[in-house]
Curated annotation (Swiss-Prot):
The lineage of its organism: Archaea, Thermoproteota, Thermoprotei, Desulfurococcales, Desulfurococcaceae. Catalyzes the attachment of glutamate to tRNA(Glu) in a two-step reaction: glutamate is first activated by ATP to form Glu-AMP and then transferred to the acceptor end of tRNA(Glu). Belongs to the class-I aminoacyl-tRNA synthetase family. Glutamate--tRNA ligase type 2 subfamily. A motif ('HIGH' region) lies at residues 104-114. Signal peptide: none annotated. The gene is gltX. InterPro entries: Gln/Glu-tRNA_Ligase, Glu-tRNA-synth_arc/euk, Glu/Gln-tRNA-synth, Glu/Gln-tRNA-synth_Ib_cat-dom, Glu/Gln-tRNA-synth_Ib_codon-bd, Rbsml_bL25/Gln-tRNA_synth_N, Ribosomal_bL25/Gln-tRNA_synth, Rossmann-like_a/b/a_fold. This is Glutamate--tRNA ligase. It is an enzyme of class 6 (ligase). It catalyses: tRNA(Glu) + L-glutamate + ATP = L-glutamyl-tRNA(Glu) + AMP + diphosphate. It is found in: Cytoplasm.
Length: 562
């Protein structure tokens, strides 16, 4: 299917799901998700996709649906089939009216743990022909200061995972919205400015008693709020609290903090600088936005249950109806460092292959399809679940095996002279079944090639070996003068009765550095044609690796898994 045909399929489907109007960004994302090989040409294909999107948007709804059913009927069912595989029906869901969101904090790069709510929320929105929102929750410039580069990085990671979004928001640019609702809340008597010292407040809270500011008239509260907004209070001198139940069994729920002062002259926000000093907490901003953005279903981890309780008080004060909230169990990822703080301490950058960031996993060689499949298989179970490196590797192998070039690589190399009466030729396919092409090597009589020392030791015991796709050789010993092993030509055709090992070999070798994340880097000799490859390779008998570039005629590889 060419680019125009792919674009037509996904533009029609996107228009069908969204009232007849296709959006360019999600169509581009869908095209690249179906044909990842087009990613290097993305700048060239975007004008083509844009032209197709405009063409589709000029069609009537009836015409869009007719063409979609006639030419791409599978597009109407494929997303539903994917979703049914790992996700149960969504409660309180009405087709065409479901709206979900992914709300990352851009204080670090997107991690494997973040991928679960992103993938699941997106899948549900599309399964129910709804909408999906990307919302950056960046309202803490002090303790969770946003990384300027993380905004775009997260968007790139989502696109790579095959996730498109219909709406995009930045909470730091919605401060006036929050201030307006805060005033409304204060006027309704649902919030108040508290200037109690923290120790005094905690004592009152633990005793279930109100602080002196709680019952001040709304008019006085609004005057205090004006003073806070004018900068008359310093950091830590005042907070705004939402009135809840002072006898609530969970003390943290009692009159929780909705806004706090942050000195942005010392802690400027990367997008708004020092413009604002009063910043909403997670529960206020997230709760307000879920309502104003029309989010119908919030899917998040079980540790957010307390936040749901807090937000229920906010909604009650404002007369709003809560969205359907689904809490799934904890996800333990064995063999990965997921803590953002630990990754920072270790000095991991966003695409460090040792880190469990989406960028790191991508660079290491994990395919987006594998990550999606694993997360969908875990789903929204309320019980805790665990994913091991082996789980992810098994799914990844299913995806990449057909795309991985088979490469001969020799670690602990030893030279071997081939004693043959005439030149020998070998044609080796890059893949045994997938038609990825081949390469040819010609070996002259007496030419030296490189084998693994362990293979030569076994050849000594067995009397010989077979060089892959070349010929069978007898083991003739070691020439001390030349410092080479001697192998004598025996026959061309494969002869299983001999019981020889079939081993890899390298002629005119190039160097390769193989990085096993978390371990040492090792050196190997590889066949020269390997330096032209991109993407995945399978180092024969060793495992899969991702090409990480070529430097000074040396191939850099990141070892992936067996």
């Amino acid at each position: 299917m060419d680019v125009r045909e792919l674009a037509l399929k996904h533009a029609l489907r996107n228009a069908y799901l969204h009232g007849g109007k296709a959006q360019l960004k999600p169509v581009v994302t869908a095209v690249l998700a179906e044909s990842p090989e087009l990613r290097p040409k993305v700048k060239e294909i975007i004008p083509i996709i844009k032209e197709v999107v405009e063409e589709v948007n000029r069609m009537s709804l009836e015409e869009q649906e007719r063409i979609l059913k006639e030419r791409f009927p599978e597009a109407l069912e494929e997303r539903k089939k994917e979703t049914r595989k790992g996700l149960p029906p969504l409660p309180n869901a009405e087709r065409g009216k479901v709206k979900t969101r992914f709300a990352p904090n851009p204080d670090f790069y997107m991690t494997l743990g973040n991928a679960r709510p992103a993938i699941i929320s997106y899948e549900y929105a599309k399964a129910y022909e709804g909408r999906f929102v990307l919302r950056f929750e960046d309202t803490d410039p002090r303790t969770k200061r946003p990384l300027p580069e993380a905004y775009e990085a997260i968007k790139e990671d989502l696109s790579w995972l095959g996730i498109g979004w219909d709406e995009e928001y930045y909470q730091s640019q919605r401060m006036e919205v929050y201030y307006g609702l805060l005033r409304e809340l204060v006027r309704r008597g649902g919030a108040y400015v508290c200037t109690c010292p923290p120790e005094e407040w905690r004592k009152l809270r633990d005793e279930g008693k109100p602080c002196p500011h709680r019952d001040l008239p709304p008019e006085e509260q609004e005057e205090l709020l004006d003073q806070v907004l004018e900068g008359k209070f310093g950091e830590g001198e005042a907070v705004v609290r939402v009135k809840t139940d002072l006898r609530h069994p969970d003390p943290s729920v009692r009159d929780w903090v909705a806004f706090r002062i942050i000195d942005t002259s010392k802690h400027p926000h990367p997008l708004t600088g020092d413009k604002y000093v009063l910043w909403p907490t997670y529960n206020f901003a997230a709760g307000v936005d879920d309502y104003l953005m029309g989010i119908t279903h919030v899917l998040r981890a079980r540790e957010h249950r307390q936040n749901t309780v807090k937000q229920e008080f906010l909604y009650k004060h404002l007369g709003w109806t809560m969205p359907t909230v689904i809490h799934f169990g904890r996800l333990k990822l064995e063999g990965f460092v997921l803590s953002k703080s630990k990754m920072r301490e270790a000095g991991f950058k966003g695409d460090d292959p040792r880190a469990a960031t989406i960028r790191g996993l991508r660079r290491r060689g994990f395919a987006p399809e594998a990550i999606r499949e694993v997360m969908l298989s875990v789903g929204i179970k309320s019980s805790d679940a665990s994913i091991s490196f082996a789980n992810l590797a098994a799914e990844n192998k299913k995806v990449i095996d057909k795309k991985a070039y088979r490469v001969m690589a020799v670690e602990d190399p030893a030279p071997a002279k081939l004693l043959a009466p005439e030149p020998l030729e070998a044609e080796l396919p890059w893949h045994p079944t997938e038609g990825l092409g081949s390469r040819k090597y010609s070996v002259e009589p007496g030419e030296v090639v490189y084998l693994e020392r362990a293979d030569l030791r076994r050849a000594k015991r067995r009397g010989g070996l077979r060089l892959m796709e070349l010929a069978n050789f007898k083991y003739k010993g070691f020439d001390e003068d030349e410092g080479v092993y001697l192998l004598e030509f025996e026959s061309k055709e494969l002869d299983k009765e001999k019981g020889y090992d079939i081993v890899q070999w390298v002629k005119d070798p190039k160097g390769a550095i193989v990085w096993r994340p978390g371990e040492r880097k090792s050196f190997a000799l590889v066949e020269p044609e390997a330096l032209k490859l991109e993407g995945w390779v399978q180092l024969i008998r060793k495992g899969y690796a991702k090409v990480d570039g070529v430097e000074e005629d040396t191939l850099n590889l990141i070892y992936l898994h067996e």
